[in-house]
Amino acid sequence: MATKKAGGSTRNGRDSEAKRLGVKRFGGESVLAGSIIVRQRGTKFHAGSNVGMGKDHTLFATADGKVKFEVKGEKNRKYVSIIAE
């Protein structure tokens, strides 16, 4: 004979894996061409000079230099640029 009444099943108990998004290289850091600067969903940050954008909106350096974050334009967009050294 069971000493405890059977518990019902739950519909919870699952969660998606973290995607490791965010800024990978901060302002003033030196980077090499091809380095990932930001992983993002959508264009939270836009590509400035010497920065390319992948099909998943990842920003990467296209030249060696230092990372620079700036806000500009009428819409106050955030841009990431690489200042060549």
From Swiss-Prot:
Gene Ontology MF term list: structural constituent of ribosome
Q: Which family does it belong to?
A: Belongs to the bacterial ribosomal protein bL27 family.
What are the top taxonomic ranks of the organism?
Answer: Bacteria, Pseudomonadati, Pseudomonadota, Gammaproteobacteria, Pasteurellales
Protein name, UniProt field: Large ribosomal subunit protein bL27
Q: Give the originating organism.
A: Glaesserella parasuis serovar 5 (strain SH0165) (Haemophilus parasuis)
Q: Which SUPFAM superfamilies match?
A: Ribosomal L27 protein-like
Q: Which UniProt keywords apply?
A: Ribonucleoprotein, Ribosomal protein
**Which residue ranges run through the membrane?**
none
What InterPro entries has UniProt attached to this entry? Ribosomal_bL27, Ribosomal_bL27_CS
Q: Which NCBIfam families match?
A: L27
User: What GO terms describe the biological role, i.e. biological process, of this protein?
Assistant: translation
Q: Does the keyword Ribosomal protein apply?
A: yes
Q: List cellular component terms (GO).
A: cytosolic large ribosomal subunit
Instruction: Give the start-end ranges of region Disordered.
Output: 1-20
